[in-house]
Design a protein with these regions (language model features):
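Conserved extracellular-gate-facing transmembrane-helix segments in secondary transporters
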Residues: 32-41, 140, 284-288, 329-341, ...
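Residue-level signature of the transmembrane alpha-helical cores
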Residues: 91-101, 128, 217-221, 225, ...
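Juxtamembrane helix-start elements in MFS-like secondary transporters
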Residues: 55-66, 125, 170, 354-362, ...
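Short amphipathic helix-loop junctions that connect adjacent transmembrane helices
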Residues: 42-58, 283-293, 316, 339-358
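Intracellular loop-helix junctions on the cytosolic face of multi-pass helical membrane proteins
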Residues: 1-22, 115-116, 120-126, 150-339
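C-terminal ends and interior cores of transmembrane alpha-helices
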Residues: 95-118, 395-421
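Substrate-agnostic recognition of the 12-TM MFS/MFS-like secondary transporter fold
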Residues: 31, 64-70, 127-195, 336-339, ...
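Helix-to-loop junctions at the C-terminal end of transmembrane segments
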Residues: 70-86, 371-390
Length: 459
């Protein structure tokens, strides 16, 4: 038993550490920044609920608008391909937008009267909620592109690496990327546990001061991503100097170190179709037509289907079938509706969950998600994406039953029959512990396939 445990630990954790390369670090730093961004999650929930008075329905509508930038990842990714040599500028732009969003929220928490003198607090919050996802999606598409660049095409002697070695490197890097995101989440969960310890018993002014401290600490997020871009530049210069010392000329260096994406031409179908998508979404959303969301969904689905058809023409037959099947499976998986902010507010109002308990739940979820990423590493590598998503769908359905049961009073019945031991918090802890390890499993094989198999000009 001990030998088997030691072998599993070596195969799933130590091996991943042995496969780590310095060139992986820049995109991983951008991913860490994405993970650390969750630092303000609990603060935002309670601040909006306690001080801004916005309804869960309003937040759900705002979430629709905040989700539009993420729906534009395809054209933004194409823009990164077009401006490959200048993609670092997009990380700087994203960092500036994220910093602006955080500074707005810091102002709302620390100086609400001054902020309200310029425009309403609700308008400031909406502006912050829109700026933040734009910044994060810009950084995310660049980080995805950086993962392609981080996997070397040649070894230290300038010899071309075999496809099998690069495929393993891509899978390792995507796994490390999920580890970086979740590791950032673990870090912020620990900070939240420490910051919110006993906060429910503090006076209002003291709570506000803690909220302001958290938003101030969150300004480290854009700094981390910018540092990753600077490190990537230094690593590229180091690699070029090392190969130059071995006698390679500048033309050979460019072939070995630079992506062929530098030579691609704009795909006006992708860019034009994306403009149509934005026009449909904004015009219908602003006009507040009846069935507006349904119109936006059908319109955007038509545009995306057309763009997918254009993309499929660039692939070989096997890759075309794989991408199409993957897209359908992921679409259905992602289309499953979630409870939104209403679920968290119900836990706060009805179940009595406070800041410190939600922080502990977040910590448990982050740690076990990280554990699940290691524990299911072989499962992700050996199973198809369709199998993985089907497994996650069935498991997620089963694990949603305890929350549904608590809505109908399950926690009251269990508490009455266990002397108060199995109450709402106990059920929430167990459910979170079971559900969390599955959190990132679907993403790793999909991203690894894209990095390894997509055409060089359409990564």
């Amino acid at each position: 038993m001990l030998a088997a445990t030691r072998r599993w630990f070596d195969d799933n954790i130590l091996e991943l550490g042995r496969e780590m390369r310095l060139s992986y670090l820049p995109p991983l730093m951008v991913y860490v920044a994405a993970g650390v961004s969750g630092l303000t999650g609990i603060v935002g929930t309670f601040f909006v609920k306690e001080y801004l008075g916005l309804s869960a329905a309003f937040l759900a509508a705002l979430g629709f608008w905040a989700g539009i930038p993420w729906a534009l990842k395809m054209p933004l990714g194409h823009l990164v391909d077009l401006a490959w040599r200048h993609k670092a500028g997009l990380v700087w732009l994203g960092a500036a937008l994220i910093a602006a969003s955080l500074l707005i929220m810091l102002g709302l928490v620390a100086e609400p009267q001054r902020m309200g003198g310029i425009m309403s607090l609700e308008a400031w919050f909406v502006l912050s909620a829109i700026l933040s996802p734009v910044g994060y999606v810009l950084q995310d598409v660049v980080a995805d592109a950086m993962t392609v660049e981080a996997v070397p095409r040649v070894n230290d002697r300038g010899e071309t690496l075999p496809p099998e070695a690069r495929r393993l490197m891509n899978t390792t890097l995507q796994t490390l990327g999920r580890v970086a995101i979740i590791g950032g989440g673990v870090l912020v969960s620990l900070v939240n546990v420490l910051m919110f310890r006993g906060v429910e018993s503090l006076p209002n002014a003291a709570r506000i001061a803690i909220y302001a401290q958290v938003y101030g600490m969150a300004l480290v997020v854009p700094a981390i991503s910018v540092a990753g871009v600077l490190l990537a530049s230094l690593i590229k210069r180091r690699d070029a100097a090392r190969l130059r010392a071995r006698g390679f000329d500048e033309t050979s260096l460019r072939a070995m170190l630079e992506s062929p994406a530098d030579t691609i031409q704009p795909d006006w179908w992708i860019l034009g179709g994306s403009l149509v998508f934005v026009a449909i979404s904004v015009s219908v959303g602003v006009s507040q037509l009846e069935f507006g969301q349904e119109i936006i969904f059908l319109g955007s689905l038509s545009v995306i289907t057309f763009l997918m058809a254009r993309l499929l023409r660039e692939l070989d037959e096997n890759s075309r079938r794989t991408l199409l099947g993957t897209a359908i499976v992921i679409f259905v998986f992602r289309a499953m509706p979630g409870p939104g902010a209403g679920s968290t507010w119900w836990m706060i109002d009805v179940l009595g969950f406070d800041q410190s308990f939600l922080a502990r739940l977040s910590l448990i979820a982050s740690v076990l998600t990280l554990f699940g990423l290691f524990g299911f590493r072989r499962f992700m590598g050996e199973r198809s994406i369709a199998y993985i998503v089907g497994f996650l769908t069935l498991t997620g359905t089963l694990l949603s039953l305890p929350t549904l049961g608590m809505y109908h009073g399950l926690h009251e019945w269990t508490a009455a029959h266990t002397g108060g031991i199995v109450d709402a918090r106990f059920i929430a802890l167990i459910d979170t512990a079971l559900e969390s390890p599955l959190g990132q499993i679907a993403m790793v094989p999909m991203l690894a396939w894209i990095a390894n198999s997509a055409p060089a000009n359409l990564k």
